[in-house]
């Protein structure tokens, strides 16, 4: 997993509530067995028409909106528990998804696959949308160590599980983190279990 401490990036505003995993990555594109190559089908039915032509009005098809941060409406990632949704978002190039609430299974899948999910207050997200539509080039700072999102003179703290935070900062998935403390585990076992 890639280390994540601080990110400076512009953002893509997708102000739609209840985006489910089938909208994120339609089921007909789930036949791959690796985590890569899903990004090209992210929001496929919203980005392209049935003939494969680009829908110019969809936010990801507008050149003025880009970046490594996706800002969404509430209840993002609801629906089925497909891990492919997190893979598609990550493969497309997003490193962070911001919402005021995520579907629980999606949130866990995202965090397990190196996609940081940040829950912020609805008022702060509304402020982001208002500002970003006026200026798509606003630079956001995501600081994981100090757990805040900042843009212009606006700053909001967010919560993250300590274990997941440590994984992101060190670039470990769950198993790699355990291997990183293997010696400590062995010492603990010798002192406490085998006596």
Curated annotation (Swiss-Prot):
Keyword Amino-acid biosynthesis carried by entry: yes
This protein's UniProt keywords: Amino-acid biosynthesis, Branched-chain amino acid biosynthesis, Leucine biosynthesis, Lyase
UniProt keyword annotation of Lyase present: yes
Pfam family, one: Aconitase_C
Biological process annotations from GO: L-leucine biosynthetic process
Enzyme class label: lyase
Cross-referenced InterPro entries: 3-IsopropMal_deHydase_ssu, Aconitase/3IPM_dehydase_swvl, AconitaseA/IPMdHydase_ssu_swvl, IPMI_Swivel, LeuD
Domain of life from the UniProt record: Bacteria
Reaction catalysed by this enzyme: (2R,3S)-3-isopropylmalate = (2S)-2-isopropylmalate
GO cellular component annotations of the record: 3-isopropylmalate dehydratase complex
Pathway(s) where this gene product acts: Amino-acid biosynthesis; L-leucine biosynthesis; L-leucine from 3-methyl-2-oxobutanoate: step 2/4
Gene Ontology MF, one: 3-isopropylmalate dehydratase activity
TM ranges: none
EC number: 4.2.1.33
Subunit structure: Heterodimer of LeuC and LeuD.
Family listed: Belongs to the LeuD family. LeuD type 1 subfamily.
Summary of the function given for this chain in its UniProt record: Catalyzes the isomerization between 2-isopropylmalate and 3-isopropylmalate, via the formation of 2-isopropylmaleate.
UniProt xrefs under PANTHER family: 3-ISOPROPYLMALATE DEHYDRATASE SMALL SUBUNIT, 3-ISOPROPYLMALATE DEHYDRATASE SMALL SUBUNIT 2-RELATED-RELATED
Protein name: 3-isopropylmalate dehydratase small subunit
Source organism: Karelsulcia muelleri (strain GWSS)
Gene behind this protein: leuD
């Amino acid at each position: 997993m890639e280390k994540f401490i601080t990110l400076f990036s512009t953002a893509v505003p997708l102000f739609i509530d209840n985006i489910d995993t089938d909208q994120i990555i339609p089921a007909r594109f789930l036949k791959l067995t690796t985590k890569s190559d899903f990004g090209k089908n992210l929001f496929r039915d919203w980005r392209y028409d049935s003939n494969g032509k680009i829908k110019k009005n969809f936010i990801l098809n507008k050149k003025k909106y880009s970046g490594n941060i996706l800002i969404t409406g509430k209840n993002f990632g609801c629906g089925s528990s497909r891990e492919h949704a997190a893979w598609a978002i990550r493969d497309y190039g997003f490193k962070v998804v911001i919402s005021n609430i995520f579907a629980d299974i999606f949130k866990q899948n995202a965090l397990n696959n190196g996609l940081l999910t940040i829950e912020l207050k609805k008022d702060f997200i509304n402020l982001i949308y208002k500002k970003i539509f006026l200026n798509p080039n606003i630079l956001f700072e995501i600081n994981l160590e100090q757990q805040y999102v900042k843009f212009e003179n606006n700053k909001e703290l967010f919560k993250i599980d300590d274990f997941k935070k440590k994984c992101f900062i060190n670039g470990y998935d769950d198993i790699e983190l355990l291997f990183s403390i293997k010696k400590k585990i062995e010492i603990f076992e010798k002192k406490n279990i085998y006596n």
